[in-house]
Amino acid sequence: QGYFASHYPLIKLPGTFYNYSTGTTNILSLIMKNKLSQNGIDYYDFVEKNLLIPLGLKNTTLEFDKSDTFIGGSSVYASARDYAKFGYLYLRDGVWDGDQIISKDWVDMTRTPSKHTYNLYSNKFWHVNEFRENAFNFPTDTYYCAGFGGQYIMIIPSKDLIMVRLGETYNTSTNTLLSFLGEIIKEVPNI
């Protein structure tokens, strides 16, 4: 999928227009796989050594395409506890058990919405903007991963809160689901 997406023609020059695309995540996976393999490192072994094992993610599966490239835009399957650990890593500035797993600079950049995405997105995480805060009762520091069918890992630093939502909600609108999650978040006191 990364190979296919990387050979699709650009419609706009990079940095001039924002449109969400899962394909770009698959391109990043392909680039990462190629860089790692140039150094004799297997992609899965790298992820396992640097993320899965340190965080104790025992119920997490990554899906790879036929070219052995991680389908990064949609194919991480995990338990709610494992997703929560991933969110907690970001809540704690990339530190797990005293070890810096993800650089604080990366986490800070992830927490800062990109102006190129109308302040909606950064480093594969969605952000709350003024519209979403008002509509769904989210604190403005909320950022989250949103997966197919209504999977969410929500990180809310002002409440010291991680919220994971799993389930199949293909027939429920995103706004209905986010409104429901916002009502739950609203009841959690700020720290």
In which residue ranges do the predicted regions lie?
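Stable alpha-helical elements in mature extracytoplasmic
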Residues: 1, 24, 43, 47, ...
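Catalytic-site signature segments of enzymes, centered on catalytic residues
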Residues: 1-69
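Active-site Gly/Thr loop motif
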Residues: 3, 57-59, 112-164
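Solvent-exposed loop and edge beta-strand segments that line ligand/cofactor-binding
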Residues: 11-21, 71-77, 145-149, 170
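Active-site-proximal alpha-helical segments within enzyme catalytic domains
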Residues: 24-32, 74-95, 151-167
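Active-site-proximal binding-pocket segments
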Residues: 46-111
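Structured C-terminal helix/loop/strand segments within mature extracytoplasmic catalytic/sensor domains
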Residues: 145-191
